[in-house]
Amino acid sequence: MNILGIETSCDETSAAVLSDGSVRSNIVSSQRCHTDFGGVVPELASREHERLIVSIVDAAITEANIAKNDLDVIAATAGPGLIGAVMVGLCFAEGLAWALGKPFVPVNHVEAHIFSPFISDEPGHREPKGDFVSLTVSGGHTLLSVVRQDLGYEVIGRTIDDAAGEAFDKTGKMLGLGYPAGPVIDRLAREGDSDFHRFPRALTASSQTSKSYRGNFDFSFSGLKTSVRTWLEAHDSEYVQKHQADLAASIQSAIVEVLVEKSVAAALLHKVNAISVAGGVSANSGLRSAMQAACDRHGIELFIPALAYSTDNAAMIATMAQLMIARGKYRIEDNSYGVAPFARFEAARKGAR
């Protein structure tokens, strides 16, 4: 089965072809037009997707060495994301599917991230043998879920204010690192001292009594931003510049420690022996190494996507579509067009999907 996946939920325009479970192509174009604005401008993102979508899809099909008529299924992100950006890929995909007489599969962007560690062209590809805890962490989302083999899941924790990726970008902006700042903080942190300053770790065992913490898997990063701003205002610019790497390491440590602590605690509480980490922040080297070390200490198996599949990409959309079909979550014979895009992630906090 040949599946074309299309992803346009934020500022990456991507198309990929999956053939019988193997990635044949994965073309990603990251928009650079937002740098001067310090964040993604929704209208600019939509216009860039409109400008690039045809050439990106054509490139993915060409690299896969197939013809459009060889496609069996077309899938695209239906949300969550910037609604105008989502609509570009969704409408294009539905139109192409209709024109070719092929079934269309709408995919939840966050769910695609959850299963991205299992994209089948990874070296040493493997999957959990049972249920697992998923940490999905990006610029827009920070979710902790317990995932079942039938693709159902229960969200047990989410951010109550800012996402972890947003915390990286906004604190980095305060340090004058530009946008996106996450990768720059990661690079600087390797040269800095994470013990230079201890920024707050909200909603963790170290920040409150064990009784109030137990079972609380929500996240909060707004206090970290405030703490960083307060620290910067109390020190002159020369001192800040001198210790930029130390500050980056301290900020990264504060974010990573929370993510790791809650993920491992969730796995132990729910008695699962596997954790997956996905989303753009899963590319962070500090998170990868700290999560691996914590999992090793507790005998938990760790699954993280290859770097190419950590950030937004269409291979994960095509892979999710394949899983939905294979595991009975989507029936091709029930195919319909005119799917409504959605901006926000809607998942029940209690009860399985």
From Swiss-Prot:
Keyword Methyltransferase: no
Cofactor note: Binds 1 Fe(2+) ion per subunit.
Binding site for Fe cation: 109, 113, 312
UniProt GO MF annotations: iron ion binding; N(6)-L-threonylcarbamoyladenine synthase activity
EC number: 2.3.1.234
Places the protein is found: Cytoplasm
Cystine bridges: none
Swiss-Prot/TrEMBL cofactor(s): Fe(2+)
Family of the protein in this entry: Belongs to the KAE1 / TsaD family.
Protein name: tRNA N6-adenosine threonylcarbamoyltransferase
Organism per entry: Chlorobaculum tepidum (strain ATCC 49652 / DSM 12025 / NBRC 103806 / TLS)
